[in-house]
Amino acid sequence: MSKAGTWIKMFVVGTVICVGGPALVQAIRPTDEELFKRYNPELQRRSLEEGDRRAQEFDDYVNKLKQWSKSDKSIWVAAQEQQEQMRTQAAVQRSQAKDEAKAQREEMRKELLGEK
């Protein structure tokens, strides 16, 4: 066979592989609806219940990414700063709750002892 024939044959084989492979995968891959129908009823129910919550969490995450990307800093640095801010706020809230509980206990103790 001539060199031109070999080149043509290799071009045809390459095209079949490059086009046929993804086409085959697309043809045999089940759709989301087909996969959902294969679930047992309990998984279907749980998936339907949690679907909205997961979609909302994903939307929140995407919005956070958009917010972080507007910053001059790297997304990872901005995310880390926000996590640190959240930790600080949580620590402040815990300390406030602890102080309120302590004040409430002190007030209850005073009421029990009749000091009020």
UniProtKB/Swiss-Prot annotation:
Q: Which residues cross the membrane?
A: 7-29
First-listed, main subcellular location of the protein, grouped into a coarse class: mitochondrion
Q: Does the keyword Transcription apply?
A: no
| Record keywords, A-Z | Chaperone, Coiled coil, Membrane, Mitochondrion, Mitochondrion inner membrane, Transmembrane, Transmembrane helix
**Record's GO cellular component terms:** mitochondrial inner membrane
Membrane protein topology class: Single-pass membrane protein
Q: Name one Pfam family in it.
A: CBP4
Among InterPro entries, the record links this protein to:
Cbp4
Biological process (GO) annotations? Answer: mitochondrial respiratory chain complex III assembly
What residue spans carry the region label Disordered? 87-116
**Compartments reported by the entry:** Mitochondrion inner membrane
Q: Where is the composition biased (Basic and acidic residues)?
A: 96-116
Which positions are tagged coiled coil? 78-116
Family to which the UniProt record says this protein belongs: Belongs to the CBP4 family.
| Known function | Essential for the assembly of ubiquinol-cytochrome c reductase. It has a direct effect on the correct occurrence of the Rieske protein, core 4, core 5 and apocytochrome b.
Please give the name of this protein.
Assembly factor cbp4
